[in-house]
Amino acid sequence: MVSPRAPAEHARAHDGPDSRVQPEIPAAAGRMLGLPEMRLVTYDRRGHRRLGAILDGRVVDLPDAVGHPAFPATLEAFVQSSRGTVLDAARAALARPDVKDHVVKRARVLPPLFPRSLLLPTSPESLSPTEGSGLERRVIGPEQDVPWPSEAAWLDYEPKVAAVLGLETTDVDTEAVAERIFGYTLVSDWVAKDASGDPVGTSDGVPIAIGPCVVTIDGCDPQAMFLQAKVDGSELAKGNLNGSARSLFGLIAAASRGTVLERGDAFALGPFPARDDDPNRRLWPGALVELAAEGIGTLRNRLGPRP
């Protein structure tokens, strides 16, 4: 289980041409499961992480919109208390006419959350109780550059969808996993390779990109989710999650055997088969990588130069 590491500090919000959020996040994507959907982000408020929600393509400060001093100020805290009145208060605030008074101008979006832990197997079959144990990976957000590891000849790219738990979970069946999930987000995972294609360095050498938002389960049907991955504008892979969603549920069920999974734990799985012989998976410095999903938006990152 990977323990994501937050950056030591965050740059302050910068000026921009308008108040629209920089990453591409849909203003609305329908109400798939009958409840008002929420697309939750974290933005930089004077150097601190702050909970926001997307409304008409803009960031709304959710704690200010709710107006209660006990309402969570971060997405991590929101996940920990994401049942009953907290969810109701958030939805009610976003539905009020005066919610536009709380739109954040020139919002700079950060990684939406730092999961308590993040399991990143290459496939459900590769899951083991100790996979990733004790390792730390730095987390970056949308529109941030990926620092190039000094030992890498090239990077392998693994686009993934992550489910964030909203309830404590133990010994759960696959069929019961969906109701325990808080929401979904996108993950771009990278593996440093040498010239012969073998992994090099440590697994914490390349940060994980997460974002651009977390969509709550009431606004997202994972089995119907359509994803597309691009490199420098050219399509790398696309497809519907379909069976991959059930594989993700199975991954969580397997991880819950004999242990307690906590709120805020996240599990990510790639919907596209890995092919080591695919030259398009070899990424080089300067490549622009985009992972898009209906209802979530586009996670966009550029690979940095060689050090």
PLM regions and their residue ranges:
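Short hydrophobic alpha-helical segments enriched in small aliphatic residues
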Residues: 11, 15-16
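N-terminal non-catalytic cap/leader segment that marks the start of a structured domain
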Residues: 20-129, 288-292, 307
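A conserved acidic, glycine/proline-rich C-terminal tail/linker
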Residues: 25-30, 37, 247-284
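Short, charged beta-turn/beta-strand-edge "cap" motif at the junction between a beta-strand
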Residues: 46-48, 125-127, 168-170, 272-276, ...
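Short strand-turn-strand beta-turns centered on an Asx-Gly dipeptide
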Residues: 55, 231-233, 270, 294
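Glycine-enriched loop-and-adjacent helix/strand subsegments that border the catalytic/binding cleft
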Residues: 110-253, 258
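Generic structural signal for buried aliphatic residues
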Residues: 161, 267-268, 289
